[in-house]
């Protein structure tokens, strides 16, 4: 935020990419947990961190201004020669490829689809995330040395054993949750009943360009919102969402719900599907819902209860089920020792992501279940650390590893009464563009003036935590930090005596002599 406030956008982008290789994507689709933690929210409204990041990352969309991180040259001969395979080009796989390439590897990314991005490309609507943004971010990773092989499904076109024979030393499996779930009710096997991930994939692939009639969406999460908004923009006469939860319990965010209603979708809370009705030709003509009286039990577990006598039937031309996602493994793990747990997710070490098959690491939705892009990006970063250590002889996956534990600022201890009350900047919504091209991005990027105004709202409350197990007080970090963000102060000068450089040798000489005598004669 400080670099952006000073207009040092190139440096700001470089700093962002230390932790997030896909800032232009996250600036559009992130769930903004950083803003939830922003201290400015105690004054009025949180700083629009995501919008500022989006502005900075716009530089990546132009070849003349994009930032391609320098790649480490680890050996005299050049980069590392160990071959690493990344299976899946979603956010986790792209993140892992980025950080491995930065370390000097040439990772190979296998993607079964014809385009990279995973659910970023085939799940998130284009009016939220234009696909050329994804292509621009991927191009940077390619320029860093990663290789992308599209249209290759590992397990079908090539097996893990065959890749091992080709010299691959480690594998990162990040195929995401590409399957959907049905509700297990009568009539759901009809042609006009589909699952959300398949529906979104067809829309984003251009296979659906119009959707007349009535569309009923079952589910209350952000994916269900995306389905409903797509249906509205494709011309459905009536779009309605039905979910088990009350409005306060809905998984979808308040912002997502508001945008769906603005697009023309209706939301009915407290209903669960009972039966899909078909006409004489076997086509969907309606669906019956039953009142949901309770979603979770006393221990907070998902255990819905219904009133079977309180029913509601609605007409429908199609039904889209958005009640969960599943992992489609295919033959990827055939013959491997990788173990699967709840929901068919891969079991792995929670810190290193290593599975029971030592050279196979997992991450993203195949490990956590459906989650947000930023979580997958973080997992890919950690996997890159693990894989780097794994392929280097004599290395450990855990010792000396950055635990990356988040230490929250005590916001109750911050004095906020004296700060100004400048209002939060809001990105312009271009309704004319939205009307003319419903599937183009219509929320515009901040202007430079807005960025200056918004970054000025930052309270600068960030705090750094020093690891006393590693820091020896040498001060080298203060000279190496490219952003001049580190300063070393002597809180307890009485613990040691400071001497000028010219007097260093005489002052250290007696201690060096004493130590040499102890070593030579074994004195303790």
Q: What spans do the regions from the language model cover?
A:
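Beta1-alpha1 glycine-rich phosphate/pyrophosphate-binding loop at the start
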Residues: 3-7, 13-19, 42, 46-50, ...
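Ferredoxin-like iron-sulfur electron-transfer modules
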Residues: 13-32, 68-85, 92, 121-122, ...
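Glycine-rich dinucleotide-binding loop and its adjacent helix/turn
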Residues: 56-77, 136-156, 180-234, 340-356
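Flanking helices and flexible, charged tails adjoining ferredoxin-like Fe-S electron-transfer domains
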Residues: 47-49, 53-83, 102, 106, ...
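A conserved FAD-binding loop/helix module that cradles the flavin
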Residues: 363-394
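Iron-sulfur cluster-binding cysteine motifs and their immediate structural context
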Residues: 1-6, 27-56, 115, 146-148, ...
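FAD-site-proximal beta/loop scaffold in flavoenzymes
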Residues: 189-212, 297-370
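Feature captures the FAD/FMN-dependent oxidoreductase FAD-binding
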Residues: 4, 78-85, 135-185, 275-288, ...
